[in-house]
A protein has these predicted regions:
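Small-residue (G/A/S/T)-rich helix-start motifs and N-terminal tracts that mark the onset
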Residues: 1-133, 142-159, 164-291
Length: 291
């Protein structure tokens, strides 16, 4: 039976910042994200990782995306990649990305990359060889759904963050079937694939590889906009980079993301709030956790 995530649980799991620490103390995230069409996805994912406390976030993407993100989030480090004919990251960039990702704690793969052959080829190159935890989101999940097995580094954490459509593709089901059995489907897939599944939607489900199932009570329909999931994926990656076990990183990420949305809705209303508005409320939540 699923357990409901609580504020006390989340605040107890969050790592505390030490006086004698430095940026290396809080983990390194590589975000492989963005394309000419979906530049904002990379910006939101990278900032999500930083706002969740990661010490260093590197965005690997094409130059048009990097230019857009640098203007919004100068705290990022950037790895320029070759651009494909469709405006995404070319598979020819795989070797250069792999050289850099091997020094990271987490690879976030997918937000805004585009559902293209290049994305699939990059995942085949990087997933099994990255040597770090892997968070698959968006087009990373779409690419994985077409493969015979999930591409991952052996023995290292894997976190999947699908919405119902992506979960349906992973499982070979219809969206209606996924929505009719959210807890069981997420839990079964997490056990079968030895991973953490974050099945997004109303009362997001977080399932672990040992049969753990949590349901998130926070969040509201104001999150029903493009970009909300990019922030969540970045947050989970940022928390995992700081040393939280993958299940705990997912539990904390979904609760904080939803709680920030609830506070944001009080300020701006569910109609008027936008995903990037969550960052101000997220900061207030982390401040409360530090008290």
């Amino acid at each position: 039976m699923a357990k409901e995530i609580t504020a006390q649980q989340v605040f107890g799991l969050l790592p505390r910042r030490r006086q004698d620490s430095h940026k290396g103390s809080y983990g390194k995230v590589m975000c492989l994200a963005g394309s000419a069409r979906f530049r904002g996805a990379a910006a939101l994912a990278a900032e999500g990782a930083l706002r969740a406390g990661a010490g260093l976030v590197t965005l690997a993407s094409v130059e048009p995306v990097i230019a857009a993100v640098a203007a919004r989030c100068p705290e990022c480090v950037f790895l320029p990649c070759r651009q494909s004919a469709g405006g995404g990251v070319s598979a020819q960039s795989g070797k250069a990305v792999l050289e850099k990702v091997r020094g990271m704690d987490v690879l976030l793969f997918g937000p805004g990359l585009g559902d293209t052959p290049d994305t699939a080829a990059l995942l085949e190159q990087l997933g099994p060889s990255a040597g770090c935890a892997l968070v698959l989101d968006a087009d990373g999940l779409n690419a994985a759904a077409k493969m015979d097995s999930l591409p991952r580094s052996p023995g290292l954490p894997l976190i999947l963050t699908p919405h119902p459509g992506e979960m349906a593709r992973l499982c070979g089901l219809t969206i209606a079937e996924v929505n009719a059995g959210r807890e069981g489907i997420a839990a079964g897939y997490a056990r079968a694939e030895d991973c953490v599944v974050v099945l997004k939607g109303h009362r997001t489900i977080v399932a672990g590889p040992q049969g753990e199932v949590f349901v998130n009570p926070t969040g509201n329909p104001g999150l029903s906009r493009g970009g909300s999931g990019d922030i969540l994926a970045g947050m989970i990656a940022g928390l995992a980079a700081q040393g939280l076990p993958p299940l705990d990183a997912a539990v904390c990420g979904v609760w904080l993301h939803g709680a920030a949305a609830d506070q944001c809705a009080k300020r701006l209303g569910q109609y008027g709030m936008l995903p990037h508005d969550l960052f101000a409320d997220l900061g207030a939540l982390f401040a409360a956790a530090e008290r």
